[in-house]
Structure formats: structure tokens, C-alpha cells
């Protein structure tokens, strides 16, 4: 299957302008092929994009004497240790009588043995012995006796698996560059969401963050006045573009730098207020309390004037602020890079992986980063903050026949356009 490596950059302004305001909802029959509408949504596979590398499991979770079962893109896989100790993957179902290999044992180095009749496979899926029939079994070498093997690669302690039918693409195309950088410290964790991968990934860069995350520790410690402006924005938000046919990024990441005032630039973010008045609600204010307003002012001042100036950590435009195929969202905090990758499990569930990347210069700094991640950051960002996303996304009804978009939905809609027209294995009508 052809791999689109050099798709020309394409502006997504059309997808953004196709997202009408709430006062002017889209019209037409469900399934009409309009940018960002159900026509695009219906072209995105429910079980995921097959021709890609996906994060699958932390290497430390795979023991040496047994396999671990994991469902990915609707396929049952078994992960176990190969002959060199690295993690490998086969189809979980024994081709003999469809027993689960994950319930077997690794009796011999680099192999896994079926618990039913003792059929033993190596890391390439080749049937090497049939313990139930004995050493002279004629089953070995028979056509169809081997199990399907899935290519794997372990990077920074995380196992990635190729789920495609074609020869694997270069893993560097699908996995963030820090996984190949010896200087980078990449800490990761994962959760299982009871949601299809599409809404799990589309839960980014729209107006939900201001409301859903308003009481998260992450937002409370930020310049929330700036976040108010940033997360409410529709047409004022910077336009996006497609880079190398693989990534949807913002054209102007300087917009997201809340430290502009340190360099003498008076920004709209600096003038924003966290609390707003809603005339249609009788001039009610939200957030409701003055305490939140004052907290926003204090945190805004501290972050704009006391936080040291830092450079962006990501210099590769393809992997800058935005989303990268197949399912990796990126945000550069300048102290670290936050990434969230979604691996489809089945039609109803997804694995969500979180990456925290930093570049500590000393052993002590690396030790501190690991400790901070273990006792604080992982909870703050991936449970307290993203747990709010999880709670909302799990109750969505994604397949309803109608969606009424707002201009602030431009980024998720542009991602649909990226997948439908640029991803490997998705047919263009």
C-alpha cells in the first residue's frame, strides 16, 4: 500500500470556515460530504488507521515467563519476550484450535507455548514444536500452522507495534522525535478510556477546556485570563496548516507564548479578563465568584512577569503544537513537552498514552524529574486534568446523525480533514 510521505502542505482555512457559528448551524442531510461534516467523519475507520505504528504497552509490564494479552485496533495480540529479551507480538489466537496464547507460558527462550495442545511459536510466529503430538509431529511446517507476527520496536521503555498489512513505514514518521534522542527524558503512563478513539482524539484545542477544566489544578495554576481568551477563540485563533501530509499545526505558535509582555509586547492575552458577563442570562457572570477573578489576575501577573523566559523545546515544525498522524497531540510548555497519543482498542474503548518530555542536564535533574512525575505531575496532568476529559468523552454519543458546529470547533474538524485526505489506508472518494 502506498505511503503518502510528501503530500503537499495544505491550509486548513477551508475546514475552519466550514465550521459555522452556533447561530448558523449546518444544514443538509446527514452524511453530506461537506468539509468537517459527517461526510468526513464517516470516512474515518471506527477501529482506527491500520497503516501506522502505535504505542502498545510499557516494556516493564511484559514478564519473562508468560505473555500479556492486549487488544489493539480490534485485534487480539500477545506480547512476550523474544530471544534477545526485547518485547515481540503475535496474534493471540493459536492457528491450531484458536486457544489464547496469552494463557500459555514461555517455556523456552524466545517462544510462547499454547496452553491447549502445546504448540510452540517463536518471535516470528513460526511453529517450532507441537508438544502435545511429540517431537515427530507432522504439523510443524504445515501451511497455515504459523501465527501472524506484528513488528515491534521498544523506545524509551515503551513498545510500539505496526498494525498495517503492508511493510512497516519508517517508525520515525509516526513517533515523536524525542523517542530517538538520547538526551531526552521521556516519562510515560497510560489509561483505558471507555470511548472510541475518534472522540478521544477530537477532545482537543476547542472551547471545552475553559469549562471542563476550570477547576483542575493545571488551569488554576495557569494564566487563566490568557486561557480564557485562548480557549474561547473561534475565528480569531491562528489558522492551521498541514505539514508533510502528516501533521496539523498552528501557523503561529507565538500566539501561545504567554511571556510576550516580558519582551515589551502588549498582547490581547494580557488585557483579557477571566470572568465574563452574559447578557442573555440577565448579565450573570461566569465564573461566578470574585475569588476566581482575583486568582486569575494574580496568577496571570506571576506567570507573565516572574516566570523566567524560555525557548521552545520543539524546533521541528511537523512535531510542534498540534496533532500528528495517527493520533498524537502535542503541546510545548517550554519546560517540557506534553503529548497524548490514542491507540484504538475496539469500537468502544481506547488506550490513551501520555508522554512527558524534558531535557535535564544533570543526573540530579533527571532524578528530580522522575520523582516529580511519579508523585505529582502524572496525577496533576493525566488524572486530575485529563481525567476530566475522560469523564466527558466517555458519555458522548459520537454516532448521532447530526452535529451543529461552532467556529471554535475548527481544529477538530481540520483534524478530520487531515485523516480523511492524508492518512495511509483511508480511501479518498
Language-model segments: which ranges?
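C-terminal catalytic domain of Rieske-type non-heme iron oxygenases
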Residues: 4, 9-13, 86, 167-429
Amino acid at each position: 500500500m502506498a505511503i503518502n510521505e510528501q503530500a503537499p502542505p495544505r491550509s486548513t482555512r477551508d475546514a475552519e470556515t466550514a465550521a459555522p457559528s452556533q447561530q448558523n448551524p449546518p444544514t443538509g442531510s446527514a452524511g453530506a460530504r461537506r468539509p468537517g461534516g459527517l461526510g468526513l467523519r464517516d470516512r474515518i475507520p471506527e477501529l482506527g488507521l491500520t497503516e501506522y505504528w502505535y504505542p502498545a504497552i510499557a516494556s516493564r509490564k511484559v514478564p519473562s515467563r508468560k505473555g500479556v494479552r492486549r487488544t489493539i485496533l480490534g485485534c487480539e495480540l500477545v506480547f512476550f519476550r523474544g530471544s534477545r529479551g526485547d518485547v515481540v507480538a503475535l496474534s493471540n489466537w493459536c492457528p491450531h484450535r484458536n486457544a489464547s496464547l496469552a494463557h500459555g507460558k514461555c517455556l523456552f527462550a524466545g517462544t510462547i507455548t499454547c496452553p491447549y495442545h502445546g504448540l510452540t511459536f517463536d518471535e516470528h510466529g513460526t511453529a517450532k514444536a507441537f508438544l502435545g503430538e511429540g517431537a515427530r509431529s507432522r504439523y510443524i511446517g504445515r501451511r497455515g500452522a504459523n501465527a501472524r507476527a506484528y513488528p515491534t520496536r521498544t523506545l524509551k521503555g515503551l513498545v510500539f507495534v505496526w498494525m498495517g498489512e503492508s511493510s512497516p513505514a519508517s517508525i520515525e514518521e509516526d513517533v515523536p522525535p524525542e523517542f530517538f534522542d538520547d538526551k531526552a527524558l521521556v516519562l510515560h503512563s497510560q489509561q483505558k478510556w471507555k470511548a472510541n478513539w475518534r472522540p478521544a482524539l477530537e477532545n482537543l484545542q476547542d472551547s471545552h477546556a475553559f469549562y471542563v477544566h476550570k477547576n483542575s489544578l493545571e488551569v488554576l495554576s495557569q494564566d487563566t485570563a490568557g486561557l480564557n481568551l485562548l480557549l474561547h477563540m473561534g475565528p480569531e485563533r491562528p489558522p492551521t496548516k498541514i505539514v508533510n501530509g502528516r501533521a496539523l499545526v498552528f501557523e503561529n505558535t507565538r500566539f501561545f507564548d504567554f511571556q510576550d509582555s516580558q519582551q515589551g509586547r502588549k498582547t490581547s492575552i494580557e488585557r483579557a479578563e477571566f470572568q465574563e458577563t452574559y447578557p442573555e442570562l440577565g448579565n450573570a457572570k461566569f465564573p461566578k465568584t470574585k475569588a476566581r477573578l482575583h486568582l486569575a489576575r494574580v496568577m496571570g501577573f506571576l506567570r507573565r512577569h516572574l516566570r523566567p523566559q524560555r525557548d521552545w523545546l520543539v524546533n521541528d515544525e511537523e512535531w510542534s503544537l498540534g496533532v500528528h498522524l495517527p493520533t498524537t497531540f502535542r503541546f510545548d510548555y517550554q519546560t517540557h513537552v506534553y503529548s497524548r497519543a490514542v491507540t484504538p482498542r475496539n469500537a468502544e474503548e481506547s488506550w490513551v498514552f501520555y508522554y512527558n518530555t524534558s531535557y535535564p542536564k544533570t543526573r540530579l535533574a533527571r532524578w528530580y524529574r522522575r520523582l516529580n512525575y511519579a508523585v505529582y505531575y502524572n496525577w496533576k496532568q493525566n488524572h486530575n486534568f485529563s481525567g476530566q476529559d475522560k469523564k466527558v468523552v466517555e458519555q458522548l454519543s459520537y454516532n448521532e446523525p447530526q452535529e451543529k458546529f461552532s467556529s471554535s470547533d475548527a481544529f477538530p474538524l481540520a483534524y478530520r480533514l487531515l485523516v480523511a485526505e492524508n492518512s495511509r489506508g483511508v480511501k479518498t472518494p
